[in-house]
Amino acid sequence: MPLYEHVFLARQDLSQAQVDALAAAATEIVESNEGKVTKTETWGLRSLAYKIQKNRKAHFVLLNIEASGATIAELERQTQINEDVIRYMTVRVDEHEAGPSVMMRKNDRERSRRREREGE
């Protein structure tokens, strides 16, 4: 089956539990259409480069998916209908990245630097 990366941005006023529920709903859509979600990453609340639907920040979520094109079409259709999702993008990839994504590594690096500054 083809491999995809699906990233969506959720509104800034949602709680983390609501964002996790959105990710779980996307996983359910994929699995009910005979696909498989291999990894889910929540990158947290991040600033946007420009306002999107009056939002300056958004919760970022990444899903690594193994599924057919029809499954991805259904996932995108359901994502587009959801008012809590302000942007999404699905990209077909040759292989999924092993371990944490670049964004997660960047977040870990920033946290460790912050701890070092506070400890000094």
Curated annotation (Swiss-Prot):
Origin organism lineage: Bacteria, Pseudomonadati, Pseudomonadota, Alphaproteobacteria, Sphingomonadales
Composition skew (Basic and acidic residues), residue ranges: 105-120
Function: Binds together with bS18 to 16S ribosomal RNA.
GO CC, alphabetical: cytosolic small ribosomal subunit
Annotated region described as Disordered, given as residue ranges: 97-120
MF annotations from Gene Ontology: small ribosomal subunit rRNA binding; structural constituent of ribosome
Protein name as it appears in the record: Small ribosomal subunit protein bS6
SUPFAM superfamilies named in the record: Ribosomal protein S6
Similarity annotation: Belongs to the bacterial ribosomal protein bS6 family.
Organism superkingdom: Bacteria
InterPro entries, A to Z: Ribosomal_bS6, Ribosomal_bS6_sf, Ribosomal_S6_plastid/chlpt, Transl_elong_EF1B/ribsomal_bS6
Pfam families xref list: Ribosomal_S6 (PF01250)
UniProt xrefs under PANTHER family: MITOCHONDRIAL 28S RIBOSOMAL PROTEIN S6 (PTHR21011), SMALL RIBOSOMAL SUBUNIT PROTEIN BS6M (PTHR21011:SF1)
Keywords carried by this UniProt record: Ribonucleoprotein, Ribosomal protein, RNA-binding, rRNA-binding
Gene for this chain: rpsF
